[in-house]
């Protein structure tokens, strides 16, 4: 473990980060309905894995151990994404908490500070947010300054969690109003975590349908669900609920897309994203971004004037470092690649849309020294 003065430093450095991100319930006046392009980036299930980790990948014909993930690297990747695209949304599909010593020591506050610095547009609750009860979740949310949505998790009046999240938000992006609904997995949260008795959990499919209808009643025709309900349940929602365009999934930790086999990984036998049809025949896309901040999901969605996605261009990327490439020599000893081999790998990465060699964001990396 590196310096554990993280929180004090983070609070002073990022106390105002994310304050401009507000949960909007009243739709702003939007531009006349025309074709529209939206760029979405997302992660899920980072589980307090704040630092980069080591992992062997197959790169340029070699098995090479690299640094992968870490929120400082995610921060830099998201910064690049926002700078390189217009009309962006950056989403977190839940389970920020539990999994490393950072959670044990800081009880979610370290996660919240780094998430604030990244300035996600939306976060939805996952089952592990409830692992240590309402009080700890409240302390996490007290520090978190980004909008939180969860439509099927309803605190009773008087609960310490009352008012800590909304069922959805409406965000104006590039002159168009986007409805973003949050969902959590019901059965697993109730049976395996520790929510208080003053928290009600509602059916995922019926809740999605209710709030899609409410958003459509407000004139919203572009609707995203950020859902920690698990991949299979999210596919079910896509197939049963009209009006949904995109579901950003969490909980199941799925790496989607056979393209990742080239790196020696074993993805699920599903596309990134999976396309299904809603009851009215319109396309719905379901995407999940593996876990532990190893991968940044990315896609460009093109909507027609009726809010239907006519084209979706996916570019999910495994996030690795650019300065650590370790192999075993003839004696079985771990050594760094020489400069020529390293440059060959970096050049191969530049030409591959599904992996990125990215430096850590300096400010966030400094917090973890």
Where are these regions (language model features)?
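Positively charged n-region of N-terminal signal peptides that target proteins for export
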Residues: 1-4
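Low-complexity, intrinsically disordered regions enriched in charged/polar residues
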Residues: 7, 40, 44, 68, ...
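Bacterial N-terminal signal peptides
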Residues: 8-15
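Preference for short coil/turn "hinge" residues that link or interrupt alpha-helices
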Residues: 12, 111-113, 351, 357
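Acidic, metal/ion-coordinating pockets
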Residues: 21-323, 330
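A short C-terminal boundary segment appended to hydrolase-like catalytic domains
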Residues: 294-369
């Amino acid at each position: 473990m590196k310096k554990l003065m993280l929180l004090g430093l983070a609070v002073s450095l990022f106390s105002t980060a994310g304050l401009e991100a507000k949960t909007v319930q009243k739709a702003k006046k939007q531009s006349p309905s025309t074709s529209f392009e939206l760029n979405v980036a997302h992660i899920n299930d980072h589980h307090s894995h704040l630092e980069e980790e080591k992992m062997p990948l197959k790169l340029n014909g070699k098995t090479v151990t690299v640094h992968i993930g870490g929120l400082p690297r995610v921060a830099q990747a998201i910064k690049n994404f926002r700078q390189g695209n217009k009309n962006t949304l950056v989403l977190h599909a839940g389970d920020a908490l539990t999994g490393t010593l950072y959670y044990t020591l800081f009880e979610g506050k370290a996660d919240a500070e780094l998430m604030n610095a990244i300035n996600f547009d939306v976060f939805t609750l996952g089952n592990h947010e409830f692992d240590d009860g309402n009080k700890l979740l409240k302390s996490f949310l007290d520090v978190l300054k980004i909008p939180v949505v969860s439509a099927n998790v309803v605190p009773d009046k008087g609960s310490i969690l009352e008012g800590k999240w909304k069922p959805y938000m409406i965000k104006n992006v590039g002159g168009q109003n986007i409805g973003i609904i949050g969902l959590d997995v019901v059965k697993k949260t109730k049976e395996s975590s520790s929510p208080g008795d003053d928290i009600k959990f509602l059916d995922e499919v019926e809740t999605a349908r209710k709030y899609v209808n409410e958003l459509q009643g407000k004139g919203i025709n572009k609707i995203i669900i950020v859902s920690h309900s698990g991949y299979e349940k999210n596919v079910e929602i896509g197939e049963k609920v009209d009006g949904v365009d995109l579901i950003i999934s969490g909980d199941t930790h799925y790496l989607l897309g056979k393209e990742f086999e080239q790196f020696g990984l074993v993805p699920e036998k599903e596309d990134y994203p999976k396309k299904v049809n809603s009851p009215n025949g319109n396309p719905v896309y379901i995407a999940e971004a593996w876990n532990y901040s190893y991968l940044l999901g990315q896609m460009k969605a093109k909507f027609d004037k009726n809010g239907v996605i006519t084209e979706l261009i996916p570019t999910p990327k495994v996030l690795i470092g650019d300065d650590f490439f370790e192999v075993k020599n003839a004696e079985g000893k771990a050594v760094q690649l020489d400069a020529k081999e390293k440059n060959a790998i970096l050049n191969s990465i530049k030409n591959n849309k599904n992996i990125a060699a990215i430096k850590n964001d300096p400010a966030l990396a400094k917090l973890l020294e």
